[in-house]
Amino acid sequence: MSKIRVHEYAKKHNISSKDLMTKLKEMNIEVSNHMTMLDDEVVNKLDNEYQTEKPSVADEFEVEEKVVRSKKNSNKKKKKGKGNEDKRQENFAGRQQTQIVETPDKITFSGSLTVGDLAKKLSKEPSEIIKKLFMLGIMATINQDLDKDTIELIANDYGIEVEEEVIVSETEFETFIDEQDDEENLKERPAVVTIMGHVDHGKTTLLDSIRNSKVTAGEAGGITQHIGAYQVEVNDKKITFLDTPGHAAFTTMRARGAQVTDITILVVAADDGVMPQTVEAINHAKAAGVPIIVAVNKMDKPAANPDRVMQELTEYELVPEAWGGDTIFVPISAIQGEGIDNLLEMILLVSEVEEYKANPNRYATGTVIEAQLDKGKGTIATLLVQNGTLRVGDPIVVGTSFGRVRAMVSDIGRRVKVAGPSTPVEITGLNEVPQAGDRFMAFADEKKARQIGESRAQEALVAQRGEKSKLSLEDLFQQIQEGDVKEINLIVKADVQGSVEAMAASLRKIDVEGVKVKIIHTGVGAITESDIILASASNAIVIGFNVRPDVNAKRTAELENVDIRLHRIIYKVIEEIEAAMQGMLDPEFEEKVIGQAEVRQTFKVTKVGTIAGCYVTDGKITRDSGVRIIRDGVVIFEGQLDTLKRFKDDVKEVAQNYECGITIERYNDLKEGDIIEAYIMEEVKR
């Protein structure tokens, strides 16, 4: 006997998949979902189980049959006959059951249904459905598949609602990892905060001041050397801080689909003001769509000028509350610890307004903050639990790796057994090192976690061979037509600030079919790797005016499939974007040399011109190819073939090591020893 799936067995025995799964659990048989395969032993057990329940159903049919047969004056000895008699009685009982079943209010299906299956779901005879389809101009048999529209049309005719079931594979748990829990299960959770800003403006010193420890002094050159996550308690409430090495790591995680941050603290030095990296940090935070709190640091310096900082930040739509805006500005001195309490209170205030919640009573889900391979402990991963509760011993899938949580260590180095929402923990027990930004999910069963992890690793390998789908000017028009694009994200880099402003202003005016241009970042100087990472995370196109991408930017753009457009004239940029939006971008061609022939002899013919007797030395010569005449290594003419012959016959092509006769359009000065090079123009796949 071949294996059968849960839903197939349920359908065969006219019971719901849910009831069958409940029955299997009562029989201590583990099934994960309705797609689980049942082996012969389990099927036999189920057959025995449902056969013992049949008499009660038969009794019901017996009562119904007696009523029907009394009306028709036919009766008795119902169960005495065997073989065909039993089958006839079963069929009769089945017909009576069909007659007494009420029409459902709603039916569900997945993918498609055959005419017979639809008839069963609607409690109608297949012939009735076939008749309705015929009236609609559809010739169908009982086993013919019907699409969604046809199913809805027939069901609506009976006044029955239709719902399509979307089956999501557990290997793609990212698709349902962020599903909303019921409101009554949600509990308040700590906010997750990222500190960003220009180099040397005091990001690590601020975090150090918050944690009351001297981290900065121990780090080389005052630069954060790894991504850490720490939790602090303020007024009996917790706040989780992510310590990132600049905004690039923050955006790399977002590019991998991980939205970990709730609030961004933008650190700006009161004596320095807004710097290039400050602007980048603002754009990264805005692209992530998270609230920004501005911490005006170094207020202890004599040159501190907080008003100038406020004035400069208004240009980037960060208007302080004191000036009628909605951005919170907090003056602080991280090195002296002044204003820190006020900053923490503001974080709690934003948390209260935003109402960050999670469900602690479920299996944990979240994101990898950092991961590394330790010689003694094996794979170590810092995880941020975003929903549910992670426990020691939980089977877990992290990106394409899997394992069981062997040990958990908190941010202060203590071993813990459980970690709730917004809690950062360091775990061991994974089979390989995951990447920062990978999502994780805990499961009930280690076997299932292993299967899902292995499947995801295989899928990732296959996906690597394919190309990532990123927005490019070539497919822009198609995506606009399909309604996939409502706004085009652009990153603009130029050689001088004036060019940046002029180009950004011109681009913002473009509006084609209601699709507008959004400039998510501008800057002066070469296109950097940071620009490419932001473009990848935001699905943006990079425009360079009089600037080039550096080596790292080129490499990253190739890996991430980010479209870079380089120009030297502003109106050409505008024209290209508009043309792409209207689907009129000119195709790009490249030349491909397909063959060469050597002129061995020439013949002059009246009214024809010079005929070259040639020998094909390489590749092939085709009738529709372009040709160039090369004499002594110099190209002396470029044009088209007029005729191509083998003996007296016109031919479409002549292959290598064959002789042929050639005439060239509007050119007769052919000489022995000339090389005729044939080429074609091929459209470049962008």
UniProtKB/Swiss-Prot annotation:
* CDD domains on file: IF2_eIF5B, IF2_mtIF2_II, mtIF2_IVc
NCBIfam families from the xrefs?
A: IF-2 (TIGR00487), small_GTP (TIGR00231)
Origin, by domain of life? Bacteria
List the residue ranges of the region (G4): 297-300
A Gene Ontology biological process in which this protein takes part is: translational initiation
A Pfam family (short name) is: IF-2
Q: Which SUPFAM superfamilies match?
A: Initiation factor IF2/eIF5b, domain 3 (SSF52156), P-loop containing nucleoside triphosphate hydrolases (SSF52540), Translation proteins (SSF50447)
Stretches with biased composition (Basic residues): 69-81
Q: Which family does it belong to?
A: Belongs to the TRAFAC class translation factor GTPase superfamily. Classic translation factor GTPase family. IF-2 subfamily.
Its biological purpose is as follows: One of the essential components for the initiation of protein synthesis. Protects formylmethionyl-tRNA from spontaneous hydrolysis and promotes its binding to the 30S ribosomal subunits. Also involved in the hydrolysis of GTP during the formation of the 70S ribosomal complex.
**What name does this protein carry?**
Translation initiation factor IF-2
A single Gene Ontology molecular function, please?
translation initiation factor activity
- Segments carrying the region annotation (G3) are 243-246
Q: Where is this region: Disordered?
A: 61-98
Ranges for domain tr-type G come to: 188-357
Q: Give the subcellular location.
A: Cytoplasm
Binding sites annotated in the UniProt record for GTP: 197-204, 243-247, 297-300
Give the start-end ranges of region G1. Answer: 197-204
**This protein's GO CC annotations:** cytoplasm; cytosol
Residue numbers spanned by region G2: 222-226
Q: Where is this region: G5?
A: 333-335
List, alphabetically, the InterPro entries matched. EF-G-like_DII (IPR053905), IF2_II (IPR044145), IF2_N (IPR006847), P-loop_NTPase (IPR027417), Small_GTP-bd (IPR005225), T_Tr_GTP-bd_dom (IPR000795), TF_IF2_bacterial-like (IPR000178), TIF_IF2 (IPR015760)
Keyword terms of this UniProt record = Cytoplasm, GTP-binding, Initiation factor, Nucleotide-binding, Protein biosynthesis
